[in-house]
Amino acid sequence: MPIQPSGKETEEMEAEGDSAAEMNGEADESEEERSGSQTESEEESSEMDDEDYERRRSECVSEMLDLEKQFSELKEKLFRERLSQLRLRLEEVGAERAPEYTEPLGGLQQSLKIRIQVAGIYKGFCLDVIRNKYECELQGAKQHLESEKLLLYDTLLGELQERIQRLEEDRQSLDISSEWWDDKLHSRGSSKTWDSVPPSKRKKAPLVSGPYIVYMLQEIDILEDWTAIKKARAAVSPQKRKADGP
């Protein structure tokens, strides 16, 4: 058989059941109160969020405008500073004090010195070449002059020797002719000359025709003419040989 609880225990169990029911009722009431307060707080927080958003938005806009203004001021200030620096550099460049100008200028001056030295050396070499060429030309001209002088001397010597030889031949022929003429004059045995005879007593030249040559001159004149012709021929013959030569 099952054991039944006693009366005291039954009362305790009923009391516990009533207390649990009361506790459940209180819990439900507290939950309702909590949910109501939470709803009210949510409504209040939403209203506060909108106001805070607008306030923060206006603050951000004002800060952005302020930053833009500051940025414009800084940009203008930076522009003025850069402009003043550029003007100062321009003045330094004009006065040849700027490092951007003096350093490249020093390099250019050094390059100029080197190029001047190279140009001087090249000038010396060119002068040496011109001097050597001048000396060679001068030596060649002197040698050509000496050779031309020797050639001219030999030519003139040959011509003079030929003329002397011809003069010797002419002199010998003249000596022979003069001896022949003297012998002829002495053989006449008359003191009268041809010139002393009056023209009326001179014999007239015979009149001939054909290839005969009539000499109206005296023998001495003919001899002189013959000597002059030989001298002229002797003087003309070297020039003719020179003209016929290369």
Curated annotation (Swiss-Prot):
Transmembrane segments: none
Assembly and binders: Homohexamer (Potential). Interacts with SNX6, HDAC1 and RELA. Interacts with ARID4A. Identified in mSin3A corepressor complexes together with SIN3A, SIN3B, RBBP4, RBBP7, SAP30, SUDS3, ARID4A, HDAC1 and HDAC2. Interacts with SPOP; this recruits the protein to a ubiquitin ligase complex containing SPOP and CUL3.
Localisation: Nucleus; Cytoplasm
Principal location: nucleus
Classification via SMART domains: Sds3 (SM01401)
Comment field on protein domains: Contains an N-terminal anti-parallel coiled coil formed by two BRMS1 chains; this region can form homohexamers.
Gene Ontology CC annotation, any one: cytoplasm
Protein name: Breast cancer metastasis-suppressor 1 homolog
GO MF term set: histone deacetylase binding; NF-kappaB binding
Protein family membership: Belongs to the BRMS1 family.
Residue spans of biased composition, Acidic residues class: 11-32, 40-52
Post-translational modification (record): Ubiquitinated by a cullin-RING-based BCR (BTB-CUL3-RBX1) E3 ubiquitin-protein ligase complex containing SPOP, leading to proteasomal degradation.
Chain residue ranges for the region called Disordered: 1-57
